Amino acid sequence: MSPRRRVLLLSMVGLLLAGGAIALRVGARQPAETSALAESLAGIEAPAPTTTTTSTTIDPARQSFRAAHVGIPSVNLYPSAAASQPQLALPNPTDENVPLVFLVREEQGSRLKVAIPERPNGTELWVDKTDVVTTDVPNRIVVEVGARRLTVYRGHSDEAVMSATVAVGSDATPTPLGDFYVDISVAQTSYTPWILSVAGFSDALQSFGGGNGQIAIHGWSDTSVLGRNVSNGCVRVSFDDLWRLRDLAPVGTPVEIVA
């Protein structure tokens, strides 16, 4: 496993949450899983090629966001829309055997500027449009750390479709602030029935449980912790709210964590 992307060691047989920051364990992807991923991406129409060189940020009036699903085994990421040499290459599936997904921030000509699940927080690079398949994402998540509240909004609007009291990081291991996104959504069998991995990393923990301190939104059976600062950086929700989140926040959903 590369030192760059030892974030989540995902497993369908075990999850070590140990209070907040996540460390997941899994075996190799089965051929059927890889085939299913290929089939699902094959059914999505790829974006039409374009020759324009005008830089366009995502329209604030747009009622959805865009996720970029990588469609090749290894994807190059560039420091600018015009760069000829890549700055980074990421495997797909990832080292954790899960599909690689980005959040689209901007587009220019034949490339998209995307947020990626890498340290440091807020890293954004450019990817060729031909290397990804984009899908619309309907909602966004806002986590208010001080209020210990999570709200799901419809698109860019102020229309709330869900609100929940949550537990957040302790004073020693605070939940990081910033603009992130859901990069993995997967069932688990220990501590939480489902987990939404967030492409953000703890500022206090450079490593945790075999990973490098990536945070997540996950369920917690003891609801007495909700409304408190008790985790190692993750956002804990009740199981009932977790199921609602799973349906409202597919991969690529923006996650804004504010004070």
Annotate the PLM regions.
Residues 1-17:
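N-terminal export and membrane-targeting signals
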Residues 22-34:
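Hydrophobic single-pass membrane-insertion segments
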